[in-house]
Amino acid sequence: MDAPDVVTLDGPLLVFGGPYGNLEATEALLAEARRRAIAPSQIVCTGDVVAYCADPQPVIDLVRDSGIRVVMGNCEESLAAQAADCGCGFAEDSACAVLSDQWYDYADRHVDAASRAWMGGLPRRLDLALGGRRLAVMHGGVDEISRFLFASDTAALDAELDAVGADGAIAGHCGLPFTRVIGGRLWHNAGVVGMPANDGTPRFWFSLLTPRPDGIRIEHHGLGYDHVTAARKMRERGLPEGYAAALETGLWPSCDVLTPAELPERGIRLEPGAVLWPTDGAAADGWPRAA
């Protein structure tokens, strides 16, 4: 993946991932940004605008009209190309792969040609200058758009940071929010808004990155929204019950993609927190834990 030109921002930067066709969650996120007086140019989405939920076209329209920055996820890549599957990277015949056949078929039938063209034109990488640091924004890994990278994957994250050609990376895809500072370099995942964080609550997650004299402060925030309506619409439209129930229970229907380190954290409530990525390169704790 070639490094693009750099967009300079003053901050704060609001980051979120995975709207997943969840209209109620996406509306709530954008309303929260307005409440905080964060301009669209200071908001970035890490991709997968469309996936599991009931309103693919309305969410695309909402995101496009909002004027925020978006990078291409695997779902955009697949829908733009009218591919046979979502390109999510699920193991063959896993529960996630079987369920994805159902929601991807629904999404593919409810996205118009103009939206496919828009998705196909999204950048795979966006580089931002914030607080004197260069941050590469992408969906999965540097060279693999659907690579699952979790907080416990220290060696894999370190290798990705070696390859990224920037001071840090902002990514998505795995569905869980976390921040790691490894050898003075940042790997940050804001989580997603279209599904809960597998913590037993229906909240979604987003983050704020704010430059300060001593570094960049990274805040993880959970937010409630009208998940009842979002789940009801999924059921009315015949989408997989496991994901509709997940919107209510806060628990994923399958944990196939999780590492052994992340599996025991299923159902453990996340609490908002913050990490300082220090200017001087000093060691920094991670969130939600120091891995």
Kindly give the residue locations of the regions a language model identified.
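Anionic-ligand binding region
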Residues: 154-193
